[in-house]
């Protein structure tokens, strides 16, 4: 069976082409300043997974939902809210931390994250459930941990022991999430030896770099694709 093909679309957005031929988008903010022009208008979307409700992660989810009707993987409050915004059957698969669901042959286990989750507009912020991460098990058995926006937390040890991810996708930009030094601690807690950094380089505030992560995370293979570049895992 083919490998998992992971394409970084800038910030915390990823396109994943699965061994079973499905196309998954994680946190599709395709209008982010680092997303290549050729990736801004997808030709196909089978599944969307959202880690939390901030605009730089929800991105174009509602528009993609209306265009392609993909299955939506999200915590129940966020999923229900997105259905109210026009996402067809958006709340159908809403679930919560500790739960595992199978969607299009892909298994999603929702994990804890330390962050916030709300949508901001003219009025008070709209609470959209707790932030989350996922360990995603693909059709060939490969497991990738998408941590979402988070700080390191000691229960990452449980994620590593119980869900056993092969690769960890971790934010490293600092300011809004953990930076490289704390991400190295997260990798030690997880016991994962391969890491794809994200949530860096989008704005001047996000100062963390893959080079700094490599300095702190000795013994870990840091895979740092350019925006639009595809790697196999």
Model feature map: region roles:
Residues 32-33, 54-59, 79-82, 99-102, ...:
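Active-site environment of divalent metal-dependent phosphoester hydrolases
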Residues 119-189:
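Active-site-proximal loop/helix segments of hydrolase catalytic cores
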Residues 22-24, 46-49, 106, 142-144, ...:
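Structural motif
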Residues 16-20, 103-104, 136-140:
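Active-site beta-strand termini and strand-to-loop segments that position acidic
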Residues 59-101, 106-119:
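Glycine/small-residue-rich loop that forms an oxyanion/phosphate-binding "nest" at active or ligand-binding sites
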Residues 1-23, 29-34, 107, 111, ...:
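Zn-dependent metallo-beta-lactamase
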Residues 71, 83-101, 182-233:
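Binuclear metal-ion centers of metallo-dependent hydrolases, dominated by the metallo-beta-lactamase
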Residues 15-54, 59-66, 74-80, 116-127, ...:
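Pre-active-site segment of Zn-dependent metallo-hydrolases
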């Amino acid at each position: 069976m083919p490998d998992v093909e992971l394409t970084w679309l800038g910030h915390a957005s990823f396109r994943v082409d699965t061994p079973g031929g499905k196309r998954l988008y994680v946190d599709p903010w395709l209008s982010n300043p680092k997303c290549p022009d050729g990736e801004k208008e997808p030709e196909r979307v089978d599944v969307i997974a959202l880690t939390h409700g901030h605009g730089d992660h929800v991105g174009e989810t509602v528009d993609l939902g209306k265009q392609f009707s993909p299955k939506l993987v999200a915590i129940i409050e966020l999923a229900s809210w997105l259905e109210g915004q026009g996402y067809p059957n958006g709340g159908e698969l809403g679930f919560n931390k500790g739960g595992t669901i199978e969607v299009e042959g892909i298994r999603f286990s929702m994990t804890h994250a330390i962050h916030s989750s709300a949508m901001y507009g003219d009025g008070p912020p709209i609470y959209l459930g707790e932030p989350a991460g996922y360990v995603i098990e693909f059709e060939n058995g490969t497991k990738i941990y998408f941590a979402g926006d988070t700080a390191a937390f000691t229960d990452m040890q449980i994620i590593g022991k119980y869900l056993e991810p092969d690769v960890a996708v971790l934010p490293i930009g600092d300011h809004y999430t953990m930076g490289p030094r704390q991400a190295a601690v997260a990798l030690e807690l997880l016991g994962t030896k391969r890491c794809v950094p994200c949530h860096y380089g989008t704005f001047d505030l996000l100062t963390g770099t893959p080079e700094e992560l490599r300095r702190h995370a000795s013994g870990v293979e840091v895979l740092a694709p350019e925006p639009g570049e595809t790697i196999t895992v």
